[in-house]
């Protein structure tokens, strides 16, 4: 799942 940041996890 994504989050507000430069990278997104699964």
Curated annotation (Swiss-Prot):
**Which Gene Ontology molecular-function terms are recorded?**
peptidase inhibitor activity; toxin activity
Protein localization: Secreted
At what positions is Pyrrolidone carboxylic acid found? 1
Principal localization reads secreted
Keyword hit for Ribonucleoprotein: no
Lineage: superkingdom: Eukaryota
GO CC, sorted alphabetically, is: extracellular region
Q: In which tissues is it expressed?
A: Expressed by the venom gland.
Q: Which GO terms describe its biological process?
A: regulation of blood pressure
UniProt keywords, alphabetically: Hypotensive agent, Metalloenzyme inhibitor, Metalloprotease inhibitor, Protease inhibitor, Pyrrolidone carboxylic acid, Secreted, Toxin
* Role noted for this protein: This peptide both inhibits the activity of the angiotensin-converting enzyme (ACE) and enhances the action of bradykinin by inhibiting the peptidases that inactivate it. It acts as an indirect hypotensive agent.
As for family, the record states: Belongs to the bradykinin-potentiating peptide family.
- Protein name per its UniProtKB record: Bradykinin-potentiating peptide
Phylogenetic placement of the source organism: Eukaryota, Metazoa, Chordata, Craniata, Vertebrata
